[in-house]
């Protein structure tokens, strides 16, 4: 099984790199504000029609544009969900959502989290899924990419105060990157058997004579952007373990590739935009190393399984609980790491049923800030925060002013970096503590002991880091949990974006300093190791005590 696991990981990464490199070149053109071939005339018509000027924005104007779009989207989505029963395309006549659930869901999809405290097929109409959730899947993904575009321009420009035009960036990202790639993926899903219709649910009679109602809907179109935009919210409650969302091994592979496609392509785009492809490759190597190690650990833990299974008379200790037989333990383990390394949150197996160590790794990947590939845009700007921290630490060790890509890193940048890195750990630890201190928080736990605490810690980690996956043993659809997680999702998203944009505004006005003999090379193996160490050190120091109370204690309770 070790050979199968190695081949699965190697083939996945190889296909990913082949697909990501050309997409990275296209993204680099958008970063440089150069229209893609053949669309310049279309863009001019769009700018005139939409009233978008060529005026570039400083970091405050750029941030204000993004916040305005997202807050407006939040309000519209809340209204769509709350008044769902009065809106069209609701063949099952599903009622509107409660205020707390509508708020939680609206915040969830606007922040690219896609945490779902409801069952899609029994709660949401087709109109809510299409006009509400799918639209936000595009816009939240475009927002993350726009932020990293602004940060990359801050490194590549000098002696200016502008970072581009947010409205032009959002339109270009949506029309020329997200929409065409999502369309290709959706057509592939339809060919593989994923439904795409507006039919009412279909009553059928099973082979045993039982009556069953099969849910229908525009699944393929939402599934495509759900994966490509690292959104993760499923059309159905079972998410990508549902045969209507993920019917075959091919769709399973395509979904994993779609999750990592843009995050990997952005690394290539960063190298091209910086004028040194080695810079992008260094980040890609660092991400890939952590990713491969995590996949290996989860695969090993799930193959070793639970010794209690053998004691109960099972043929094997391999942990197949909560996994689809059409995927198996290795593909399910790979999917779990992919979806939590990126801020996707889609699942093709139940993470709550993983072994203690197998479930701890996805949880830890979220807790370190979703920087191992990460979400579209958010993964790269999160990793660049760790890059700034790493060069600052290196500067302290060698007694030089830290700099990256020729830009000196001063006190202001380090304050904003520290703030951005500390936002999500504070939300996770304080939110988990609050949940464990209150009856409303503890009453949602369906399991006692360390595993029950792990469910709480996983939920808050997922919300604060905008992932959206869950240990399903937590009954989270209550006013307390809906409001707590909505707060964590909102602050975890925009509490990081704001300091990132402030860093971009500070760096873009600085002059690029020529490299000297004392300049730290940020593209070699030494720096890659330093960067990995920084990520691991921050994650370890912050979350080891909490993990020790949950998955670690659960692991050592086994014989």
Curated annotation (Swiss-Prot):
<dbReference type="GO" id="GO:0005886">
    <property type="term" value="C:plasma membrane"/>
</dbReference>
<feature type="transmembrane region" description="Helical">
    <location>
        <begin position="379"/>
        <end position="399"/>
    </location>
</feature>
<dbReference type="GO" id="GO:0008556">
    <property type="term" value="F:P-type potassium transmembrane transporter activity"/>
</dbReference>
<keyword id="KW-0997">Cell inner membrane</keyword>
<feature type="transmembrane region" description="Helical">
    <location>
        <begin position="524"/>
        <end position="544"/>
    </location>
</feature>
<keyword id="KW-0812">Transmembrane</keyword>
<feature type="transmembrane region" description="Helical">
    <location>
        <begin position="5"/>
        <end position="25"/>
    </location>
</feature>
<feature type="transmembrane region" description="Helical">
    <location>
        <begin position="27"/>
        <end position="47"/>
    </location>
</feature>
<dbReference type="Pfam" id="PF03814">
    <property type="entry name" value="KdpA"/>
</dbReference>
<feature type="transmembrane region" description="Helical">
    <location>
        <begin position="283"/>
        <end position="303"/>
    </location>
</feature>
<dbReference type="GO" id="GO:0030955">
    <property type="term" value="F:potassium ion binding"/>
</dbReference>
<feature type="transmembrane region" description="Helical">
    <location>
        <begin position="253"/>
        <end position="273"/>
    </location>
</feature>
<keyword id="KW-0630">Potassium</keyword>
<feature type="transmembrane region" description="Helical">
    <location>
        <begin position="170"/>
        <end position="190"/>
    </location>
</feature>
<feature type="transmembrane region" description="Helical">
    <location>
        <begin position="484"/>
        <end position="504"/>
    </location>
</feature>
<feature type="transmembrane region" description="Helical">
    <location>
        <begin position="327"/>
        <end position="347"/>
    </location>
</feature>
<feature type="transmembrane region" description="Helical">
    <location>
        <begin position="63"/>
        <end position="83"/>
    </location>
</feature>
<keyword id="KW-1003">Cell membrane</keyword>
<keyword id="KW-0406">Ion transport</keyword>
<dbReference type="InterPro" id="IPR004623">
    <property type="entry name" value="KdpA"/>
</dbReference>
<keyword id="KW-1133">Transmembrane helix</keyword>
<keyword id="KW-0813">Transport</keyword>
<keyword id="KW-0472">Membrane</keyword>
<comment type="similarity">
    <text>Belongs to the KdpA family.</text>
</comment>
<feature type="transmembrane region" description="Helical">
    <location>
        <begin position="132"/>
        <end position="152"/>
    </location>
</feature>
<comment type="subunit">
    <text>The system is composed of three essential subunits: KdpA, KdpB and KdpC.</text>
</comment>
<keyword id="KW-0633">Potassium transport</keyword>
<protein>
    <recommendedName>
        <fullName>Potassium-transporting ATPase potassium-binding subunit</fullName>
    </recommendedName>
</protein>
<feature type="transmembrane region" description="Helical">
    <location>
        <begin position="416"/>
        <end position="436"/>
    </location>
</feature>
<feature type="transmembrane region" description="Helical">
    <location>
        <begin position="356"/>
        <end position="376"/>
    </location>
</feature>
<comment type="function">
    <text>Part of the high-affinity ATP-driven potassium transport (or Kdp) system, which catalyzes the hydrolysis of ATP coupled with the electrogenic transport of potassium into the cytoplasm. This subunit binds the periplasmic potassium ions and delivers the ions to the membrane domain of KdpB through an intramembrane tunnel.</text>
</comment>
């Amino acid at each position: 099984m070790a050979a199968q696991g190695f081949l699965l990981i190697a083939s996945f990464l190889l296909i990913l790199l082949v697909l990501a490199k050309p997409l990275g070149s296209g993204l680099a053109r958008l970063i440089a504000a150069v229209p893609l071939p053949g669309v310049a005339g279309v863009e001019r018509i769009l700018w005139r029609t939409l009233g978008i000027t060529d005026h570039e924005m400083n970091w405050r104007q750029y941030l204000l544009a993004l916040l305005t779009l997202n807050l407006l989207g939040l309000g519209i989505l809340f209204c769509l969900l709350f008044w769902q029963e009065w809106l069209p395309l609701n063949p099952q006549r599903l009622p509107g959502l409660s205020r707390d659930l509508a708020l939680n869901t609206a915040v969830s999809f606007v922040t690219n989290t896609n945490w779902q405290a409801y069952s899609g097929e029994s709660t949401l109409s087709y109109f809510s899924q299409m006009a509400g959730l799918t639209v936000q899947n595009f816009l939240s993904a475009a927002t993350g990419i726009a932020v990293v575009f602004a940060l990359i321009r801050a490194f590549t420009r000098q002696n200016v105060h502008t970072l581009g035009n947010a409205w032009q960036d959002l339109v270009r990202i949506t029309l020329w990157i997200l929409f065409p790639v999502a369309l290709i993926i959706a057509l592939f899903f339809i060919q593989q058997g994923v439904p795409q219709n507006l039919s009412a649910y279909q009553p059928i009679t099973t082979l045993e004579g039982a009556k069953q109602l099969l849910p229908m809907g525009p699944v393929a179109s939402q599934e495509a952007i759900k994966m490509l935009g690292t959104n993760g919210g499923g059309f159905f409650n079972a998410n990508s373990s549902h045969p209507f969302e993920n019917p075959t091994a091919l769709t399973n592979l395509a979904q994993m590739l779609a999750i990592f496609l843009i995050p990997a392509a952005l690394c290539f785009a960063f190298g091209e935009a910086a004028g040194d492809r080695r810079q992008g490759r260094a980040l890609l190597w660092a991400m890939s190393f952590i990713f491969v190690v995590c996949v290996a650990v989860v695969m090993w833990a799930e193959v070793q399984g639970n010794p209690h299974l053998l004691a109960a008379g099972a043929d094997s200790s391999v942990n197949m609980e909560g996994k689809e037989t059409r995927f198996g333990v290795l593909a399910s383990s790979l999917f779990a790491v992919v979806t939590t390394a990126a801020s996707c949150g889609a699942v093709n197996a139940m993470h709550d049923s993983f072994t203690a160590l197998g479930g701890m790794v996805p949880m830890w990947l979220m807790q370190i800030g979703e920087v191992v590939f990460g979400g579209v845009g958010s993964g790269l700007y999160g990793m660049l925060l760790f890059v700034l921290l790493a060069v600052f630490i290196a500067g302290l060790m060698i007694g030089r002013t830290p700099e990256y890509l020729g830009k000196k890193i001063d006190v202001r940048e380090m304050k904003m970096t520290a703030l951005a890195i500390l936002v999500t750990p504070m939300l996770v630890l304080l939110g988990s503590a609050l949940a464990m201190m209150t009856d409303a928080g503890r009453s949602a736990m369906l399991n006692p002991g360390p595993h029950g605490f792990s469910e709480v810690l996983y939920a808050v980690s997922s919300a604060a880091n905008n992932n959206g996956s869950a240990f399903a043993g937590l009954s989270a659809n209550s006013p307390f949990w809906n409001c707590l997680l909505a707060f964590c999702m909102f602050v975890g998203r925009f509490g990081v974006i704001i300091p990132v944009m402030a860093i971009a505004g500070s760096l873009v006005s600085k002059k690029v300093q020529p490299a000297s003999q004392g300049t730290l090379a940020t593209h070699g193996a030494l720096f890659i190791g330093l960067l990995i160490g920084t990520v691991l050190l921050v994650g370890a120091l912050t979350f080891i005590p909490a993990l020790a109370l949950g998955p670690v204690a659960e692991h050592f309770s086994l014989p």
